[in-house]
UniProtKB/Swiss-Prot annotation:
Catalysed reaction, written as an equation: 2 monodehydro-L-ascorbate radical + NADH + H(+) = 2 L-ascorbate + NAD(+)
Residues that, per the record, bind L-ascorbate: 319, 350
InterPro entries (UniProt xref): FAD-oxidoreductase/Apoptosis, FAD/NAD-bd_sf, FAD/NAD-binding_dom, FAD/NAD-linked_Rdtase_dimer_sf, MDHAR3-like_C
Keyword Secreted attributed: no
A GO cellular component entry from the record: peroxisomal matrix
Family of the protein in this entry: Belongs to the FAD-dependent oxidoreductase family.
Gene name linked to the record: MDAR1
Annotated organism of origin: Arabidopsis thaliana
Keyword NADP assigned: yes
Lineage: Eukaryota, Viridiplantae, Streptophyta, Embryophyta, Tracheophyta
Protein name (database record): Monodehydroascorbate reductase 1, peroxisomal
Signal peptide segment: none
Length: 434
C-alpha cells in the first residue's frame, strides 16, 4: 500500500475538477503540490458533450476534443497538460474512505493519499430504476448517461439496434436531449414521464407545449402521466418490453433512463455539515471542516442575490464554483480575500435545431412573448417571470448572442415591470434596454 502526500487534492474527474485544476495552474502551483484523483480512466472533460455531440451519427465529438476547459473557450487540458503544469493526474482510482480529521483518503486498492487542503468535486450519480426495485430493470440495454463509459455503451447500442425502438424514461434535461439525438440517429423514439409536461422544474406549461409539439413533429412519441413499472427481457437478457403503470406495454430495443441524479456525498456523511441534499458551504465553498471545500453538484451554497441557499446541478455553476474555491484558497494563503460568490442561475440546452437559455429564477407569474409556433423553421420566443412587480427570470429560444446577454442583464438587475401585458408587447426589447 503506497502513501502519497500533497498540499492540495481535488477529488473528482468531472467539470469542477478540471476547472479547479486550471485555476490552480493559473494561480501557480509547484510541481508535486496538487493531485487530481478520479475514478474515471480519462482526464476531466466537459460532460455536456455526452448527451449532444458525442452521440451524433456524423462528425461526433470525441476525446481529446472536449477535455476541460474548452466548454468555456479556455485551454484544453490534455492528460500531458497536467504533467507539464506540475499536476499529478491519478486516474482509474476510486476513493472508498475519507477521514477528514486525519486529512487522508484511501483508495479501493488500499493506497493512502494525504492532503493539507481538499476540494470535493465528486459530482452526482444517476438515479437507477434498480434503486427503486423496478422489476426487470437490470435487463441488458437499459442504459444511463453520466460518464464517458455510459456514452460508449449507448453509442454501441445505437449501432447494434440501428433503426430500432428506443424508449426514453424521463422528461427532463437528459430525456429531451437524448430523445432528440436518438431520433437524429433514426431510431423510433418514445418518451415516457409522469409529470403533466416536460421539464416541469423550469418550463411553464406554455413553454413545454412548444417543445412537446416540436418533438412530436420530429417523430418523437410522448406519453405523459405514467411511469415505467417493469421490463421484460428476451432470452439473451436484452430488454424487450417496457410495462407502464397505466397498463400499456411498449416494445423496446434500447431503454435510456434519465430520472434525476443524487450528489456523491456518502464518503463524507457524519463528518461535514449537510443541507438540502448537499454539503453545506459558505460563499467561498468552505465546508464546516477546516481546509475542506466542496464545489459543483455536491455544494449547497448561499445564493446571494436571492438570500437563499441552494444546490445547483449545472455545468456553468460547476465551472464557476471551482474557480471561486481555488481563488479563495490561494488568496487566503497570501492573507487576502476574494469577493463572495454571487451566482446568477443559468441553464441552457440544445437539441435538434433548437437552442434555449434561461437566467434567474422561475418564480411568480410568467408571460410568453414572440413566435412560439413549433411549425416555423426558426422559432424565436421567450418568457419573463415576474415576482413582486420585478422581473426575476428570463428565457429565450432561438436568441442571438446579444439577446442572450440581455436576458442575463435583466435577470441580474431585476427591473420593475409596469404590467405583464407590456412585457408581452415589448418582448426581448424590454431586456435589451436594461
Amino acid at each position: 500500500m503506497a502513501e502519497k502526500s500533497f498540499k492540495y487534492i481535488i477529488l473528482g474527474g468531472g467539470v469542477s475538477a478540471g476547472y479547479a485544476a486550471k485555476e490552480f495552474a493559473n494561480q501557480g502551483v509547484q510541481p508535486g503540490e496538487l493531485a487530481v484523483i478520479s475514478k474515471e480512466a480519462v482526464a476531466p472533460y466537459e460532460r455536456p458533450a455526452l448527451s449532444k455531440g458525442y452521440l451524433f451519427p456524423e462528425g461526433a465529438a470525441r476525446l481529446p476534443g472536449f477535455h476541460c476547459c474548452v466548454g468555456s473557450g479556455g485551454e484544453k487540458l490534455l492528460p500531458e497538460s497536467y504533467k507539464q503544469k506540475g499536476i499529478e493526474l491519478i486516474l482509474s482510482t476510486e476513493i472508498v474512505k475519507a477521514d477528514l480529521s486525519a486529512k487522508s483518503l484511501v483508495s479501493a486498492t488500499g493506497d493512502v493519499f494525504k492532503y493539507q487542503t481538499l476540494i470535493i468535486a465528486t459530482g452526482s450519480t444517476v438515479l437507477r430504476l434498480t434503486d427503486f426495485g423496478v422489476k426487470g430493470a437490470d435487463s441488458k440495454n437499459i442504459l444511463y448517461l453520466r460518464e464517458i463509459d455510459d456514452a460508449d455503451k449507448l453509442v454501441e447500442a445505437i449501432k447494434a439496434k440501428k433503426g430500432g425502438k428506443a424508449v426514453v424514461v424521463g422528461g427532463g434535461y437528459i430525456g429531451l436531449e437524448l430523445s432528440a439525438v436518438l431520433r437524429i440517429n433514426n431510431l423510433d423514439v418514445t418518451m415516457v414521464f409522469p409529470e403533466p409536461w416536460c421539464m416541469p422544474r423550469l418550463f411553464t406549461a406554455d413553454i413545454a407545449a412548444f417543445y412537446e409539439t416540436y418533438y412530436t413533429n420530429k417523430g418523437v412519441k410522448i406519453i405523459k402521466g405514467t411511469v415505467a413499472s417493469g421490463f421484460t427481457a428476451q432470452p439473451n437478457g436484452e430488454v424487450k418490453e417496457v410495462q407502464l403503470k397505466d397498463g400499456r406495454t411498449l416494445e423496446a430495443d434500447i431503454v435510456i433512463v434519465g430520472v434525476g441524479a443524487k450528489p456523491l456525498t456518502s464518503l463524507f456523511k457524519g463528518q461535514v455539515e449537510e443541507d438540502k441534499g448537499g454539503i453545506k458551504t459558505d460563499a467561498f465553498f468552505k465546508t464546516s471542516v477546516p481546509d475542506v471545500y466542496a464545489v459543483g453538484d455536491v455544494a449547497t451554497f448561499p445564493l446571494k442575490m436571492y438570500g437563499d441557499v441552494r444546490r445547483v446541478e449545472h455545468v456553468d455553476h460547476s465551472r464557476k464554483s471551482a474557480e471561486q474555491a481555488v481563488k479563495a484558497i490561494k488568496a487566503a494563503e497570501g492573507g487576502a480575500a476574494v469577493e463572495e460568490y454571487d451566482y446568477l442561475p443559468f441553464f441552457y440546452s440544445r437539441s435538434f435545431d433548437l437552442s434555449w437559455q434561461f437566467y434567474g429564477d422561475n418564480v411568480g407569474d410568467s408571460v410568453l412573448f414572440g413566435d412560439s409556433n413549433p411549425s416555423n423553421p426558426k422559432p424565436r420566443f421567450g418568457a419573463y417571470w415576474v415576482q413582486g412587480g420585478k422581473v426575476v427570470g428570463a428565457f429565450m429560444e432561438g436568441g442571438s448572442g446579444d439577446e442572450n446577454k440581455a436576458l442575463a442583464k435583466v435577470a441580474k438587475a431585476r427591473p420593475s415591470a409596469e404590467s405583464l401585458d407590456e412585457l408581452v408587447k415589448q418582448g426581448i426589447s424590454f431586456a435589451a434596454k436594461i
